[in-house]
Amino acid sequence: MMSAPKITFIGAGSTIFVKNILGDVFHREALKTAHIALMDIDPTRLEESHIVVRKLMDSAGASGKITCHTQQKEALEDADFVVVAFQIGGYEPCTVTDFEVCKRHGLEQTIADTLGPGGIMRALRTIPHLWQICEDMTEVCPDATMLNYVNPMAMNTWAMYARYPHIKQVGLCHSVQGTAEELARDLNIDPATLRYRCAGINHMAFYLELERKTADGSYVNLYPELLAAYEAGQAPKPNIHGNTRCQNIVRYEMFKKLGYFVTESSEHFAEYTPWFIKPGREDLIERYKVPLDEYPKRCVEQLANWHKELEEYKKASRIDIKPSREYASTIMNAIWTGEPSVIYGNVRNDGLIDNLPQGCCVEVACLVDANGIQPTKVGTLPSHLAALMQTNINVQTLLTEAILTENRDRVYHAAMMDPHTAAVLGIDEIYALVDDLIAAHGDWLPGWLHR
């Protein structure tokens, strides 16, 4: 290793995300002199990120260098860490297409980035480019560690380790640590007092144990307190981001039924199951406060907010931000210095969870040190949680097989097995929907889908 790492960002035009990750990086002593290589295909967005990153670096007293690239392989050369954060096809046209075509066929969605027709199409658009990153890494930085933040996380991660098993990679999300903080806030307790053990699949992991530290140093189960707060109307608290559309009722109701709390948000979870979004059942939407079309609304708001923020950053002499809850800088620091840390990552199920399929993508606690990312064994999940996860893994299995073998039929089979889609549409209607999505996305999808 050199004295300072090289950190390459693929999709550096995702300026808000880059800002959060590098804000953390620049405050770690071992990473302050890192070479930051920013790469994006959009020169304007790339330059915007460059402005923000330079001010972040200077404000934090970091002294590394920044290079900007529109060519991926050039940016990756000799990298130690590769952070991937992009959206193939963007909000427009592709996300809009996913929502509008599905709606024409009678299928409502909330986020559409993980499962269902929206998640399936996003995977088909995204995986070929992730594979190209793996190809380039194999050639110019074979020992680098990839930190992948791109959804649909499980399918993307699975497709990469299936085709490029030699690439060191982990899929990262902030739902485990983020929800833990959220639950602490709901109960008015310090998040630092929490202790938990969590496992499952991306966006559907559960806190198998959730405890808080008491005054005498012992730990007590937090679940009875959490349930009592919900039933008394004291939890959940209003959305911390001020988003009144997202009220977090779905997860608390699932907690009442299952006995365990899930990591991903209510707006996500509502579309991973067959129970909350049904034609003609406005009563369910109202009762559970399901925010239909949430992701497109969020995209419009974020774009507007970003333009405002960017103007402020351009005028500011310095940029100081609070530490984020993202794992990226923790992982880099642990690998670079050997100082051990524990994170939650999405990895191949090599005997980690006994009652989920071997080889599927699971989210578990991982030890990180100079040896890299080392997933920890969970054992057997409660059977009802594993059964629920399996309904989502079915879709992931078939879609991953579809793209690995270029089997168009498996794309339809994946959509057929989606719990929400199957609860709303008949078989022929599902096939017609997939036909229309493939046609509408055109060249954003791999050529074999159009043969």
Swiss-Prot record:
It is an enzyme of class 3 (hydrolase). Its EC number is 3.2.1.22. The active site is at residue 174. Binds 1 NAD(+) per subunit. One of its GO terms (molecular function) is manganese ion binding. NAD(+) binds at residues 5-71. SUPFAM superfamilies: LDH C-terminal domain-like, NAD(P)-binding Rossmann-fold domains. Its cofactor is NAD(+); Mn(2+). Keywords: Carbohydrate metabolism, Glycosidase, Hydrolase, Manganese, Metal-binding, NAD. It comes from the Bacteria. GO terms for biological process: melibiose catabolic process. Mn(2+) binds at residues 173, 203. Transmembrane segments: none annotated. InterPro entries: GH4_Enzyme_sf (IPR053715), GlycHydrolase_4_CS (IPR019802), Glyco_hydro_4 (IPR001088), Glyco_hydro_4_C (IPR022616), Lactate_DH/Glyco_Ohase_4_C (IPR015955), NAD(P)-bd_dom_sf (IPR036291). One of its GO terms (cellular component) is cytosol. Substrate binds at residues 151, 287. It catalyses: Hydrolysis of terminal, non-reducing alpha-D-galactose residues in alpha-D-galactosides, including galactose oligosaccharides, galactomannans and galactolipids. Belongs to the glycosyl hydrolase 4 family. Homodimer. PANTHER family: 6-PHOSPHO-BETA-GLUCOSIDASE-RELATED, ALPHA-GALACTOSIDASE. This is Alpha-galactosidase. The gene is melA.
